[in-house]
From Swiss-Prot:
PROSITE patterns: RIBOSOMAL_S4, S4. It comes from the Bacteria. CDD domains: S4. One of the primary rRNA binding proteins, it binds directly to 16S rRNA where it nucleates assembly of the body of the 30S subunit. It holds the Pfam family S4. Gene3D superfamilies: Ribosomal Protein S4 Delta 41, Chain A, domain 1, RNA-binding S4 domain. GO terms for cellular component: small ribosomal subunit. This is Small ribosomal subunit protein uS4. The gene is rpsD.
Length: 202
């Protein structure tokens, strides 16, 4: 399943607030469609599926990518669900978003893909690059790159900078000081349900 490129508010109405996907809030609290207001009691499978979809749409990853992340999380020590969230949060596109350089993860991905972002003084144009403690993330020293990020910073997606990151707004340089802690993950998600969803599939 490819990355979603359709109407974002339609997804937000169905799944709830997704801070990485869009800054806008749905005006209607019920899902789209003719029967959106008349939701029947959902099965356990439907609930697990919805949590999985939240993860996919918020971080903008395909189904194949998410399965790979689940497999990596299983191989690691500790909580599979928490490790899964950390892997997604430490992606370069999400890190650029959390630093405030872009208002959404899709906007951050575009900055990365177009070569506007340097990691340790090298252009990294792969959005899925896994950031590590010690990485220095900065804007490319070109007028176009700096203007794009400065414009984005006027309307940041999330106000609070996570404790594992630091960012200098004057130099547009950020640093990764560690791995994100669970309490700093902005998405309202039950990651255990996602792990259960993939228990027989990944």
């Amino acid at each position: 399943m490819a990355r979603y490129r359709g109407p974002r508010l339609r997804v937000v109405r169905r799944l709830g607030e997704l801070p990485g996907l869009t800054r806008k809030n749905a005006r209607r609290a019920y899902p789209p469609g003719q029967h959106g207001q008349n939701r029947r009691k959902r099965s356990e499978y439907a609930i697990r599926l919805e949590e999985k979809q939240k993860l996919r749409f918020n971080y903008g990853v395909s189904e194949k990518q998410l399965i790979r992340y689940v497999r990596r999380a299983r191989r690691a020590t500790g909580s599979t669900g928490q490790t899964l969230l950390q892997l997604l949060e430490m992606r370069l596109d999400n890190t650029v978003f959390r630093l405030g350089m872009a208002g959404t993860i899709p906007a951050a991905r575009q900055l990365v893909n177009h070569g506007h972002i340097l990691v340790n003084d090298r252009v990294v144009d792969i959005a899925s690059y896994q950031c590590r403690p010690g990485d220095v993330i900065k804007v490319r020293d070109q007028d176009k790159s700096r203007k794009l990020v400065q414009a984005n910073m006027e309307y940041p997606g999330l106000a609070n900078l996570p404790s594992h990151l630091e960012f200098d707004k004057n130099t547009l340089i950020g640093k990764v000081n560690g791995v994100i802690e669970r309490e700093w993950i902005a998405l309202n998600i039950n990651e255990l349900l996602v792990v259960e969803y993939y228990s027989r599939q990944a």
